[in-house]
Amino acid sequence: MWKDLILEIKDILESVNYKLNTPATDTEVQRLREHAKEKLNVDLPSEYVEFLKTVNSLDFDGLVLYGVDSFLLETEKGEQICGFIEMNEIWYENEFQKEYLFFGDSNIAWFCKNLSEGTYHELDKPSGTVMNTYDDFKTMLEEALKITLL
């Protein structure tokens, strides 16, 4: 389902002469996994890895989904990428946010995983109040994309 939404976004972008970012390679994803483990002490969800292998970061209509950081890429692609490691390090400057792993944000929300509960949340930005809870990354991703396409 989320892949269909990505295709819809792709069509919209192409209609105004923009493109989706290219997919991350296996090597790039592996580098991200290693850095996430080393710097953030987390394993990446398989659904997030699948997203990265479809499109490495997405910036569309106020929704930004993080990708493999530029310093982990095999080659410079000239694409706008909000890096997963970089963005989590920024959000972790606020102590209460260290309980979350951030995958993206919008003008009004963060999309993240509660590390102690294992649940996925849409948090109000900037208060951090839970607006929605999801059982898995895939469902959270689909809802974020649907909202953006409204």
Cite the ranges covered by each PLM segment.
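Short, solvent-exposed aromatic-acidic interface loops
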Residues: 126-128
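Compact, glycine/acidic-enriched structural inserts
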Residues: 130-143, 148
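Short, well-ordered, mixed-charge alpha-helical segments that flank or form enzyme active sites
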Residues: 110-112, 130
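A surface-exposed partner-binding patch
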Residues: 1-110
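Short acidic-glycine loop/turn motifs at beta-strand connectors
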Residues: 114-117
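Intrinsically disordered, low-complexity regulatory segments enriched in Ser/Thr/Pro
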Residues: 119-124
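Hydrophobic/aromatic-lined pockets within catalytic cores
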Residues: 53-56, 145, 149
